[in-house]
Curated annotation (Swiss-Prot):
Locations listed in the record: Cytoplasm
Name of the gene this protein is made from: tyrS
Database matches in HAMAP family: Tyr_tRNA_synth_type4
Xref: SUPFAM superfamilies: Nucleotidylyl transferase (SSF52374)
Positions annotated to bind ATP: 239
Full protein name: Tyrosine--tRNA ligase
Organism: Saccharolobus islandicus (strain Y.N.15.51 / Yellowstone #2) (Sulfolobus islandicus)
Molecular function in Gene Ontology: ATP binding; tyrosine-tRNA ligase activity
Gene Ontology cellular component terms for the protein in this record: cytoplasm
The keyword Protein biosynthesis appears for this protein: yes
Length: 361
C-alpha cells in the first residue's frame, strides 16, 4: 500500500486530523506507527460506536499497530453502570466481542486492560506529572470528555483525575496516533500541549464524527456559547436514551421500527441520522446502496457513493420512507453476524440484561 493510499484510508470519514501534515510525515518515516483508542465499557454497544470501530479496522489495514484500551477504571471513576467494576468488566468483554464480529481482526490488536496499568507505580507517577503540567481550569474544561460539564466537577474529586489519566494512557503506551470521537478533542489537545512541556512524543489526533441520535439535532441542553464539539456531544446517539439509539443487539424488527420512526425531514441533510448512518456506517462497508421504489415513482435506483445519494435526497429525488427502508435493510445486514454471535453465547445474553438495567449517563 502506497503512502497516499495509507493516508487516504486512515483519514477516510474522519471529522478532524490534528494535524494532517504530521500524519503524513509519520507515514513517510516508514517507522511502525502505534495507535490506540480507549473505550469506556459503559453499557450496550450502539451503532454510533461502529464509526470508530470501522476506523480501527482502517488503521489496522493501513499497517498501524493498534491498541484497544479497555478503560475499566475510567468507567468506574465516571460512575458508569452504577460503579460496579465487575459489570464494567463484563461490558468490556462484550464490546471486544462486538468489535471482533464486526470484522476487525482482533488478533492484530494489542488489547490492554486499565486494571493492569493502574497496578504499575510508574503509571501513577506519570498521572501526577501530567497533572503538574496542566492548570486546574484546563482539567475542568476537559471534563466534557466524560460526557460531563465543568460545573459537575464538584460531584467527587476523582473526576478531576480522569483527564490526567487519559493523557497518561497516551504517554504510557508511547503512541503516535490517538483515535477518538470529536468529544475526545479536549483530552487529545491537552495531551499535545503537555507533551511539549514534558518532552514526550506529540500524538496525531484522529477524531471520528459522533452519530446524531435518532431524534436529530434536538436537545434542550444546548445553550448559547457552547463549543461545536460540546454541541455534537449533546446531540449524539446515547445508550442512556434507548429510543434515540440503535443497539447492535436489537432485533431486525426493532432496527426497522427505530429507523422508520427516526428524524428524516424531506430534502434536509443537516443532523439527519439516516443520512449519517448511510455515510459513516453503510457506505464504508458496501460499494453501493439500492433504493427500492415502485415503478410509478421512478423504479429502483442505485448509488455508488454517499455524495451522489445525498445530492439526490436534497434535490427531493428520494423520498424519506424509501431512504429509511434501504437504510434498515443494509444496516440489518451489517448487524446480523454480530447478533448471531451474541446469541450463541448465553453469558452475553445475561450480560445484556444486566447492563440494560444498569445503564447510567
Amino acid at each position: 500500500m502506497s503512502i497516499d493510499q495509507r493516508l487516504q484510508l486512515i483519514t477516510r470519514n474522519a471529522a478532524e486530523i490534528i494535524t494532517i501534515d504530521e500524519l503524513r510525515k509519520k507515514i513517510e518515516s516508514e517507522e511502525k506507527l502505534k495507535g490506540y483508542i480507549g473505550f469506556e465499557p459503559s453499557g450496550l454497544f450502539h451503532i454510533g460506536w461502529l464509526i470508530w470501530t470501522q476506523k480501527v479496522k482502517d488503521l489496522v489495514e493501513a499497517g498501524v499497530n493498534m491498541t484497544l484500551l479497555r478503560a475499566t477504571w475510567h468507567a468506574w471513576i465516571n460512575d458508569k453502570l452504577g460503579g460496579d467494576l465487575s459489570l464494567i468488566k463484563m461490558a468490556a468483554d462484550y464490546t471486544v466481542e462486538v468489535i471482533k464480529n464486526y470484522g476487525v481482526d482482533t488478533t492484530k490488536l494489542n488489547i490492554v486492560d486499565a486494571d493492569d496499568m493502574v497496578k504499575e507505580k510508574d503509571y501513577w507517577a506519570l498521572v501526577i506529572k501530567v497533572a503538574k503540567n496542566a492548570s486546574l481550569a484546563r482539567i475542568k474544561r476537559a471534563l466534557t470528555i466524560m460526557g460531563r460539564r465543568a460545573e459537575e466537577a464538584e460531584i467527587d474529586a476523582s473526576k478531576l483525575i480522569y483527564p490526567a489519566m487519559q493523557v497518561s494512557d497516551i504517554f504510557y503506551l508511547d503512541l503516535d496516533i490517538a483515535l477518538g470521537g470529536t468529544d475526545q478533542r479536549k483530552a487529545h489537545m491537552l495531551a499535545r500541549d503537555v507533551a511539549e512541556k514534558m518532552g514526550k512524543k506529540k500524538i496525531v489526533s484522529i477524531h471520528t464524527p459522533l452519530l446524531v441520535g435518532l431524534q436529530g439535532g434536538q436537545r434542550m441542553s444546548i445553550t448559547e456559547g457552547m463549543e461545536e464539539d460540546d454541541i455534537q456531544a449533546e446531540i449524539k446517539m446515547s445508550k442512556s436514551k434507548p429510543e434515540s439509539a440503535i443497539f447492535v443487539s436489537d432485533s431486525r424488527e426493532d432496527v426497522e421500527r427505530k429507523i422508520m420512526g427516526a428524524y428524516c425531514p424531506k430534502g434536509v441533510a443537516e443532523n439527519n441520522p439516516i443520512l449519517q448512518i448511510l455515510k459513516y456506517i453503510i457506505f464504508p462497508r458496501y460499494n453501493f446502496v439500492k433504493i427500492e421504489r415502485d415503478i410509478r415513482y421512478g423504479g429502483d435506483v442505485e448509488f455508488k457513493d454517499y455524495e451522489e445519494l445525498e445530492r439526490a435526497y436534497i434535490e427531493g429525488k428520494i423520498h424519506p420512507m424509501d431512504l429509511k427502508k434501504a437504510t434498515a435493510r443494509r444496516l440489518n445486514e451489517i448487524l446480523e453476524p454480530i447478533r448471531k454471535s451474541l446469541e450463541r453465547k448465553p453469558e452475553f445474553e445475561e450480560m445484556i440484561q444486566k447492563i440494560s438495567k444498569s445503564v447510567t449517563r
